[in-house]
Amino acid sequence: MRILLIYMLGLSGIACASSIKEIVKESREKLEKGLGYKLSSSEIRMLRRLFEKNAGLETRVVIPVILHQSKVVVSPGTRYRDIEEGERKYVEKVIKLLPEVAWRSITHIYALANNDWAVDLMYDVFDKASSWRSDTVALYKGTEKKYGMKFTDLVNGIFEQNNCILKEFGRLLADRVEILIQELPGSLDDVEKKREEEVLRKIKEYGRRLCTKEKQDEIIKAQRIMCNVCEYIWKREEDRKSFIMEVYSTYLKLREMESNVDEIEEPLIYFVDHRGLINACDKYKSMDIMAELILQLFLQGKNIDDKSIKSAVRSVRERKRLEEMREMEERKRREEERAKNEEELLRMVEREKREESKGRGKKKGGKRGAGEAKEESKEEDRKEEEGVEVEEEESAEVPLVETVVGGARRKKKGSREKKMGEEHHYKVHSRVLRWKKDAEKIKRELDKGSEERWKGKSVEEIKEQKKVHDIVEVSELLRDKEKCDRFFVRTGKYMKGGSERWKMVANGILEEGGEKKVGKVEVGLFKGGRGESVVYHLMFRPTETERTGMVGGSSFGEGDDVDEIKKEKSSDMSGFRYPSGVRCEMTSNGNEFRIEYRNRKNTSEVLRTLTILRIPEIL
C-alpha cells in the first residue's frame, strides 16, 4: 500500500502546497478520486508519514519492460529487430519518453511551497540538456552493421546520460530550498514550523548528495542491477509469469486512476532502496539471490531489509537443495535403468549362446532334426512378434497419471480412446461454499465455527466480505488445465496445519455500483488424504488496500491465515452448475473470464462483475 500510494502520487502530478497539512489534503482528494473510495484513517496517517519522513525522496528504478494493452511488447533482452512490426510505432513512442522517465525517477520530489517550483526546476534542467541528448530511437534501432542493443542496455545508457546534469540540478535544488527555509511564514506555530523545516532540510541534503560522484554512481549501479536481475528473471518461466503479472497489475491500477487515458505510454517506475539493493548484491554476488529478492519486493510488497534478504537467501538455498535431491533421484533412476539394461543384455547373450549350442546339437541328429529346429525357431519368432503386439496393446489401455492444475492428479485416457480437453478434478471445501449463503446464515456458522478471527462480526461486515469471497464460479476456469495456465500463476508449496498447501493467483477487476477495483483472485489449495487437490480458500483481494478483508499479506506470500482445515468437509464440484440466468452469467473471450452476478429476483440487474484477466502475452 505504501509503495502504491507514492507511485500514484508521483505519476499523477501532485501539485506542491504550502504545508504538509495542505499537501496531505490535496493528495488525499486526488487519490480518493482515482481509487474510487474514501481513504481510511490509517491510510491518511500513512500518507502524512510519507511526506513528513521521506519528503518523496525514496529512490526509484525503471522496470525494463514495455506493455501495450494486454501484451508485453518489449522485454528486458529485446532488441529492436525482435519487436513485432505492428508494435514498432508504439514502442518508438515509448522509447522517446525514456529519458524523461529516467530523469523523473531520480529528481521528482514533493516540495512544500506556494507553487510547483520543484517540478519546474526538474524540467528546466532537463530541457536545457535536450540539445546534446542522443536520439534514443535511432540508438535502439542500431545500424545496418550493428543489430542494435538490448532494451536493458538502452535503459542503462539513458541513466548514464542523465547523470551528466544531476550535479547542476542538485546545486539549484539545494540553493532554492535554503531560500524557502528563510522564508517560512511567521504565522506557523513552533511545532508546525519545525516540521516544515525538517522536510525542507531533507530536500536540501538530497540536492547536495546529487552533486556527488558517489550518489551518481549509486543511481547508475542500482539501475544496472535492476536491469540484470529482470533479464535473469525473464529466463525462468514461472518467475517470469508471476513477475509480469505483478507489473501488469500496477499498470492496470494506473489505468484505472487515469480514467481518461487508454494506455500508460511509458515504462513503469518502481520504488527500491538503492543502497540496500547494492549492499545485497555486493555481499552475496549471487544472481539467484538478487532475483529472489526482487521477486519478493514485487510479489509480496516487501522492503529491502535484513529480514527480506535473509528470506531470499533461505528460499534460494531451499530451492537448490530440492534441485540437488531431484538430480540425485534422476541419477539413481538412470543408474538403475542402466543396470537393468545391462542385465537384460547379458541374458540375451546367454540365450543366444544356448540357442547356438542347441542348433549345433540338432544338426548332428539328421535332416529331420534340422527341420524341426527350423519350424520351432519360426514358431518362437511368431510368438515373440505376437507377444510384442499384445504387450503394446495392453500398455495402451493402462491409464497414465499426470500432474495437472495445483498438483492434483487425474487419469489420462489411452491412445485408443477419444482424446478430450484435459479436465481437472478437485473438491471445494465447505469454508468456500458457505459464502453462497445469506449473510445471516453465514454469520451464525462463523460464530459457531473454530476460526476465531471471524467470530463476532456484524451482518454488515459479513455482507462486505461476501462480495469478495462469494466467487465459487471461478472454479469453472480451474477445470481446464490449458485455460487455467493462461490465467493463473502457481506459487510454491508450503506446510501448515499438517497439510501441504499452495496457491494460484490471477489478476482481476471487481466492478460494483460504478466502482472498479483492481486486485488478485486467490485460490488456496491443499492436498487431500487421497492425493486430490481441495480448494479451501477463494477470494478477490484488492491490491490498493486490505480494507475489504480481515486477512492481510500478499497474494503471492508463502503462508496463509487458516490454521487448520477440516479435511472431511469438502464437496466434489465437478458437476456443479447454477441454474442459467438465476445467479450469474459467465463469458470468456480468451483474454478475460467474466462473471456477472445478477439479482435473483430480477436477472436483468447486474449486482457486481468479476473479470479475471489473462497473464499478459509475451510477443
Curated annotation (Swiss-Prot):
Basic and acidic residues biased stretches: 350-359, 369-385
Residues in coiled coil: none
InterPro entries associated with the record: DUF3654, UPF0329
Domain of life (superkingdom): Eukaryota
Pfam family, one: DUF3654
Annotated spans, Disordered: 350-425
Bias kind Acidic residues: ranges: 386-396
Family, similarity comment: Belongs to the UPF0329 family.
Entry protein name: UPF0329 protein ECU08_2070
Naturally occurring in which organism (per UniProt): Encephalitozoon cuniculi (strain GB-M1)
